[in-house]
């Protein structure tokens, strides 16, 4: 029998046994579902980790090319044109579109960068000289922004999945190592107590049956003894009655004596 610390504090009854069996079945089902959820999330987590590594490598290459392109623009134009671009820009050309992706019940945010149509505030920048370098630099930094948005989306999903996987794994471990063993120990305890009660009940019924047999045997013996006593008394009464009848009958004098033969 398990210790009280390793089982639920329940009263050992048939109803408690049914409740514990239902709880065990629910715990096993929940453990299976959470295990599959953890596996699905872990698979997606590894995929996101691989994509983050690729995105970082891509980001490094793109930023390197963008830096070189900006240096070319500065050299071709003959100075820093950042202030001209800032003065010309009225609204953001790049916009972020957010959506959610459901992965095994977990909502992961996904960001997507797109360019607003008809928004080209600094199209005339570099018209005098360095126009090709400016256009190439703009396209390069556009790819850099898209890479940054993709990396931000992946890293956000990475952080969320990391926390969710930890929570799910804690639940799986709690069910596997705490809830299921405690419930199984409780079921074993209830079964052992019920078996003990059944043995006690069987022993009690056996003792009751033996007592009934002894009582019946004693009753039969008493009835037989009583019947034999009645028969003996009846026989004695019959003998007494016959004796009294014999004493009360008149004696036959003639019959008692034999007649002597007379010889003439």
Swiss-Prot record:
UniProt region (Disordered), positions on chain:
214-264
Q: Which domain of life is it from?
A: Eukaryota
Q: How does it sit in the membrane?
A: Peripheral membrane protein
Which GO BP terms apply? vacuolar acidification
What would be an example GO MF term here?
proton-transporting ATPase activity, rotational mechanism
Locate the compositionally biased regions of type Basic and acidic residues. 214-230
GO CC term (a single one) = membrane raft
**Compartmental location:** Vacuole membrane
Coiled coil region boundaries: none
Supply the Gene3D superfamilies for this chain.
Answer: 1.10.287.3240
Which InterPro entries does this chain map to?
V_ATPase_D
Chain intervals with Acidic residues compositional bias: 255-264
Primary location group: membrane
Keyword annotations from UniProtKB, A to Z: Hydrogen ion transport, Ion transport, Membrane, Transport, Vacuole
Pfam families xref list? ATP-synt_D
Subunit info? V-ATPase is a heteromultimeric enzyme composed of a peripheral catalytic V1 complex (components A to H) attached to an integral membrane V0 proton pore complex (components: a, c, c', c'', d, e, f and VOA1).
Sequence similarity: Belongs to the V-ATPase D subunit family.
Task: Describe the function of this protein.
Answer: Subunit of the V1 complex of vacuolar(H+)-ATPase (V-ATPase), a multisubunit enzyme composed of a peripheral complex (V1) that hydrolyzes ATP and a membrane integral complex (V0) that translocates protons. V-ATPase is responsible for acidifying and maintaining the pH of intracellular compartments.
Instruction: Please identify the protein, giving its name as recorded.
Output: V-type proton ATPase subunit D
Which species is this UniProt entry from? Neurospora crassa (strain ATCC 24698 / 74-OR23-1A / CBS 708.71 / DSM 1257 / FGSC 987)
Source taxonomy:
Eukaryota, Fungi, Dikarya, Ascomycota, Pezizomycotina
